Amino acid sequence: MARKFELKDYRNIGIMAHIDAGKTTTTERILFHTGKIHKIGETHDGVSQMDWMEQEKERGITITSAATTAFWKGKRINIIDTPGHVDFTVEVERSLRVLDGAVAVLDAQSGVEPQTETVWRQATNYSVPRIVYVNKMDKAGANFEASIESVRTKLNGNAVAIQLNIGAEADFSGLIDLVEMKAYNYDGQKEEIEYEIPIPEDLFEKASQMRLALAEAVADYDEEIFNNLLEEKEILPEQLKAAIRAATITGNFFPVVCGSSFKNKGVKKMIDAVIDYLPSPVDVPPIKAFRDEEEITIEASDDQEFSALAFKIMNDPFVGSLTFFRVYSGVLKKGTYIINSTKGKKERVGRILAMHANSREEIDEVRTGDIGAFVGLKDTTTGDSLISEKAKTFVLERMNFPEPVISQSLEPFSKAEIEKLATALQKLANEDPTFKTWTDIETGQTIIAGMGELHLDIIVDRLKREFNVQARVGKPQVSYRETITKSAEVEGKYIKQSGGRGQYGHVWIKFEPNPEEGFDFIDKIVGGKIPKEYIKSIQKGLEEKMQAGILAGYPLINLRATLFDGSFHEVDSSEMAFKIAASKALSRARDAVGTVLLEPIMDVSVFAPSEYAGDVMGDLSRRRGLVREQETRSDGANVIRGHVPLAEMFGYSTQLRSMTSGRGTYQMQFNHYEIVPKNISDVIVKQRAIKEDD
């Protein structure tokens, strides 16, 4: 089957922002104006097309990334609407990994907010070109220029307006396109009709100056415009458009547009900007892949062998497991086999679906640039590479996900539900790489861990709604970590040689802090002192002990272990003996390597009237917090930002409401790990102390 759209006419984009900036409403308006839906839904009414989970409709927030496709002026736009709440940052992360461009939505009153900074940083990590859409221009306190300035100062982004608003707040009526130098107003029952008007006289000079500033901003990336400016020649809209596009795609420039999605103003022009300035799959650098540890690139072309990345797993009540994927090369027809090159497993593609939020359309094939879903893959999880059977094996660049920072115990109401609970939790863990579940060895309790209290609330809610499992939930607990601060060489022995076949494992390992994140295992055994077949077991013994912890039962992170000496016995040595010997070495190293406890430090932003600012800052300090910044917004609210240990933030919402007479709100997200102060660490370690292995 031939292509309906050339690859250059694809736009794979994400809508990203801070919570309540209007992402989902913006996506709804795009679908309405492109003819994908015929009735506009509102998130506050609980009838939004893109928010399809029950919890999303009730809470008016986006939890999972819904995918859909729209068509505009001969272009195919694949859209992923991502969550703005910090607890669901993994959804943003995995969406950005498979997108070619993004629309960053700002609230015109607030400008850049804390979660804007997070998603912007994620987009920068994946080199995703962006346009900025300043939404809610009709809101009290809306300020287009201040919003642009906040992108420059807080995000260090070269943001330049390509539009000028006509009026603001209640007087926001339209906009001026600075590229074309045309003005537009809006009419109709929902103001969905856009029509051209003369540029208002009182704004003509300002618009001309802003167009010149725009040309000067892109002149650094376009020689023709640079020369035209020098020679004071006219710069045509086509020239300016081409220069903006080139600068945006390289990530050097962020065009800024404005509007009010709720009022339908500026949405069509924003869709035009997506088409004009964001890249197609052929405009971005080829995707990186690895073949036998050698880096290669994959060309975006139907003529190449099929390759795709699984970026999301979802359990659907009607069809079962859905694997969302992005095709990077080649063509795949349903009914064929593919290889999961990450796991070395063969999978059969029975059905392929094109998705629209939670509705679906069955299709026969997918091609380069497509985003779709496979039904019923058995072994594939988020981040896995999928390639054709014929392809010489390679793995696409993987996604990295943060570890959970908060945990709770779960206890089913009846013993009959224990197995049901375990099955349900495993399905949810397969969907979400930042959600972990395990059984506490000491207490036998089921533990769930995630990115925040809301994250775990949603998990418990889904257990009840989707799997009909009810459970008692324990108090939230901080997910501490352990690490080492010094180097030491330690011996580990496991020798039992009395009667029958014995056990013999003997290692010398140097432990040191790993300057990079993660675990590095280095084998420096020479002369056959330990046979090669036991080396993997030694590494596994260390990894298992790291997971169990050596100080207070929390996972040990950022460790480098160099195996440099040891001995073996011809008869009594075994993989198990060396695994235990390695585990004992790490246990024995606990004091010598200066093991310490780490705690998650949160980025906290508190919004409160200025008269409460002193009380708020004092309270944060009492919680071991470090206040980093204070600013007054255009609506008079004070924003106080700081770093506070998660352990001190439980119950904070109740305290804040009491302190501010119900007028304060806050948001927080994980920032980094820090060493726990000794007086607090000593108490935690005493409660959970691990005995050193004999």
Swiss-Prot record:
It comes from the Bacteria. Its main location: cytoplasm. It is found in: Cytoplasm. SMART domains: EFG_C, EFG_IV. GO terms for cellular component: cytoplasm. GO terms for biological process: ribosome disassembly. It holds the Pfam family EFG_IV. GTP binds at residues 17-24, 81-85, 135-138. Coiled coil: none annotated. Transmembrane segments: none annotated. The keyword Protein biosynthesis applies. Keywords: Cytoplasm, Elongation factor, GTP-binding, Nucleotide-binding, Protein biosynthesis. Residues 8-282 form the tr-type G domain. One of its GO terms (molecular function) is GTP binding. Belongs to the TRAFAC class translation factor GTPase superfamily. Classic translation factor GTPase family. EF-G/EF-2 subfamily. PANTHER family: RIBOSOME-RELEASING FACTOR 2, MITOCHONDRIAL, TRANSLATION ELONGATION FACTOR G-RELATED. Catalyzes the GTP-dependent ribosomal translocation step during translation elongation. During this step, the ribosome changes from the pre-translocational (PRE) to the post-translocational (POST) state as the newly formed A-site-bound peptidyl-tRNA and P-site-bound deacylated tRNA move to the P and E sites, respectively. Catalyzes the coordinated movement of the two tRNA molecules, the mRNA and conformational changes in the ribosome. This is Elongation factor G. It comes from Mesomycoplasma hyopneumoniae (strain 7448). The lineage of its organism: Bacteria, Bacillati, Mycoplasmatota, Mycoplasmoidales, Metamycoplasmataceae.
